[in-house]
Swiss-Prot record:
Role noted for this protein: Necessary for normal cell division and for the maintenance of normal septation.
Domain spans labelled EngB-type G: 22-194
UniProt entry keywords in alphabetical sequence: Cell cycle, Cell division, GTP-binding, Magnesium, Metal-binding, Nucleotide-binding, Septation
Keyword Cytoplasm belongs to the record: no
Entry's family note: Belongs to the TRAFAC class TrmE-Era-EngA-EngB-Septin-like GTPase superfamily. EngB GTPase family.
Residues where GTP binds: 30-37, 57-61, 75-78, 142-145, 175-177
GO CC, any one term: cytosol
Name of this protein: Probable GTP-binding protein EngB
BP terms from Gene Ontology: division septum assembly
PANTHER family: ENGB-TYPE G DOMAIN-CONTAINING PROTEIN, MSS1/TRME-RELATED GTP-BINDING PROTEIN
CDD domains noted in UniProt: YihA_EngB (cd01876)
Amino acid sequence: MNVNNVEMVMSAVSAAQYPTDGKPEIALVGRSNVGKSSLTNTLIQRKNFARTSSQPGKTQTLNFYDVENQLYFVDVPGYGYAKVSKKQREAFGNMIEEYITSRKQLRGVISLVDARHDPSEDDVAMYEWLHYYNIPILVVATKSDKISKSKFNKYENNIKKQLGFDSSASDFLFFSSETKYGRDSVWEWITAHM
């Protein structure tokens, strides 16, 4: 998709604050600093539209980005960041659960994992949870520029095995915000789920 118009419409912490215009939504989930904002910036072809940070845990609300007045990207707070209080983690969990389990406009979830590492327990739990709710999932292995393409199959097989990947209900792609590898394939998945 050629993106010319993007607007950060709102940040929300509850259903009462979600957009009401009925556009389809694609949520981006993953642990802190896995690259959700970088993926967003690459997809919309902007360098710093979605704020990236070297400090994990910066996103603390559901951030709705209107893309071409056709759909929303919903940037979800990262999980697994140890310096966030237990109370705050619970609040994030409740906010994410409310959104994902009740939002009719949600067409799919892009679940980001770091291509270089085994999925965390939180990554596995999120994948299982999304799968349980029959939500279309695209697993995106970020930072793929850090591994050799000749090893993609090895890393993909490992990630899928760790997640308990179900190829009948999920898709998998490698992605790099540095090289833009996988950008078009992610857009194809998004378009197919609008």
